[in-house]
Amino acid sequence: MKSVPLITGGLSFLLSACSGGGGSFDVDDVSNPSSSKPRYQDDTSSSRTKSNLEKLSIPSLGGGMKLVAQNLSGNKEPSFLNENGYISYFSSPSTIEDDVKNVKTENKIHTNPIGLEPNRALQDPNLQKYVYSGLYYIENWKDFSKLATEKKAYSGHYGYAFYYGNKTATDLPVSGVATYKGTWDFITATKYGQNYSLFSNARGQAYFRRSATRGDIDLENNSKNGDIGLISEFSADFGTKKLTGQLSYTKRKTDIQQYEKEKLYDIDAHIYSNRFRGKVTPTKSTSDEHPFTSEGTLEGGFYGPNAEELGGKFLARDKRVFGVFSAKETPETEKEKLSKETLIDGKLITFSTKTADATTSTTASTTADVKTDEKNFTTKDISSFGEADYLLIDNYPVPLFPEGDTDDFVTSKHHDIGNKTYKVEACCKNLSYVKFGMYYEDKEKKNTNQTGQYHQFLLGLRTPSSQIPVTGNVKYLGSWFGYIGDDKTSYSTTGNKQQDKNAPAEFDVNFDNKTLTGKLKRADSQNTVFNIEATFKNGSNAFEGKATANVVIDPKNTQATSKVNFTTTVNGAFYGPHATELGGYFTYNGNNPTATNSESSSTVPSPPNSPNARAAVVFGAKRQVEKTNK
C-alpha cells in the first residue's frame, strides 16, 4: 500500500520523508465501519463560546502603557490614555528597561531612571516572586522634534506603568476564599492648566504637564504608622468564581496631618480558570482633589504554580487613569492551606526531524547524536490561560480558533512575532476546553536565526476531580497530530479544514474500572498507528499509561525498512465540566538510555529493531452520545 502524508485542505506540516522513504506505512490492523455499530455525535451540552475580548482584556503574561506628556504648543490639546496605547505583551522583562535607557542616552539625561527595574533578579525578595508591577521612567525628558512642523512640544517623564508575570497558575483551589495583599501604581492623562490637590508633591507639574504618578502623592513611608504607599487588597472566592478588592492610598503622618488610608477604587471581577475580568468602580464619581472618578475595565490573572500571587491592569473609561497591580497571599491564607488541584495544562513538545547518518559509527559522532537526542522530542510545561483560547509564543498571546464565522475544523494561520513568522495550526473547532496543534517558523518567510524545530502544544482547562464520573462507559471521538519516523523515512499528520478528513482518535473510557483504551488512526485507510492503554485513580482528573506503535514505515523502501515497534509513556487528562473532553500527548526518542520521553517518565526500552525510532503526538477528543434514530 502506498500513500502520502495528510497535507490537504491548505495545511502543511512541512515534514518530508528522509532519504529512501516516501512517508507511507502499512499496519496489520484494518478497521472497517459496520452499519450495525452505534452511530455517535458530539455531546454539546457543556460547549462554550470563545470569549469575544477587547484588546485590554486579552490574557497575557503582562502588559503596560507609556506615560504621556502635555503638548505645550499649538492648541494644547489634552493627552489621554487609550486602549490603542496599551502594550499587550513584552518579549522579555528587559524590553521596558532597554527602551527607557536608550531614550535616556539619546536625550543625554544623567539621572538614573525612577522605579523598579523590570528585571526579576533585581527585585526585593520580600515582594512578589511570580508577578510584579510598577513604574519605570526618566525625568526631565523633552521632545521638541515636531515643534516646527506640527506645533507639538512635550516635556515631562518618559517610561511605563507595567506588570509582568513569569509563571501562570496551574493548581488552584476549587472552593474556599483566598486573600491577597500588595501594591498598585497608576499613570494619568494630562490637561493644560489642570491641577489636583492630591498631587501635592508635584509642584504644579502632575496632570498639568505630564502624567501624574505615585511620587506626586505625599504617601506614608513609615510602616510604624500603618500600611505604606499604595495598597491593593483582594478576596478570591474560588467556589463562586468571584474576585473582589480595593485600591487605596495612604496619607503621610506629619505634625499637621494625621495618618489616613483612603480607598479610591472597588474591584469586582469574575474568575475564568486562572484569569479574571471585571471592573474598577471609583468611590467618588466627581472630585476636585484627584482624577480617580471613572469606572474602568480590569483584567488580570493568578501567578505561581499554586496561585500564590495575582496581578493585572485596568483602564478608566474616561481614559484619564491607567493602573497596574500585584499582590501575594496573606499570611492567613498561607496558614489555611486551601485544598488545590491541577486545573490548567500547558504542554509543549519540541523536536527536529533531522536524523544522523545511520552508517556513521565513530565515537565522536555517537556522542554528538546522544546529546542531540537528549534535547530532541522533549516535553515541557508552558504558561497557559486555562480557557485554551490563546497560545503563548515568545510571550505573545496568539489567538486560537474559532475566530469569527468560520466552518474550518482546523485552522492554519501565519503570525508575525518579533522578527519571525510562525505558522500555527490548531485543532479542533468542536473542542471547547482543550486545544492542541503545532507551530513552526515558516521556511518561506526568511526568518532570522531559523531553528528548524517543530513545536506541538496542548492547552486545557481540566475537569475538577469532584466532577469526574464514577460509573459508566463513555465513547470519545477526536483527532490527533503526530510524527513518527526512523533514520530512513518518516510519516506525519496534522489536520484538515474538513472534519471527516482528519486522522481519527477513538477512545473508550470505563469510569467504573478507571481505564482508558484508544486508537490513533490514519485518516484515509482508518488503519491503527498507535494503541493507547491508560488508567486513572479515583478522584483524579488525569490518566497515565502506554502508547504502542507496531508499524512499517514505507514498506516498499529500497533500503528494506523494518517494522518500527516501540512503547512509550502517554499522559493526559479530562477537560471541561463533567469530563466532556479529553486530551493527551506522548513522545518517543529511540533506544537511548540517557533520553527522556516525557517530563515525568524514563525511556521505555525498545526492541532491537527500533533504536532510531522517533515520535511526537498530541490528541484531543469529545464525549459522544448515540444518535437517535428518526
From Swiss-Prot:
It is a lipid-anchor. It is found in: Cell outer membrane; Cell surface. A lipid is attached at C18 (S-diacylglycerol cysteine). Gene3D superfamilies: 2.40.128.240, 2.40.160.90. The keyword Lipoprotein applies. It holds the Pfam family TbpB_C. A lipid is attached at C18 (N-palmitoyl cysteine). Its main location: membrane. Haemophilus acquires iron by extracting it from serum transferrin (TF) in its human host. Acts as a transferrin receptor and is required for transferrin utilization. This is Transferrin-binding protein B. It comes from Haemophilus influenzae (strain 86-028NP). The gene is tbpB.
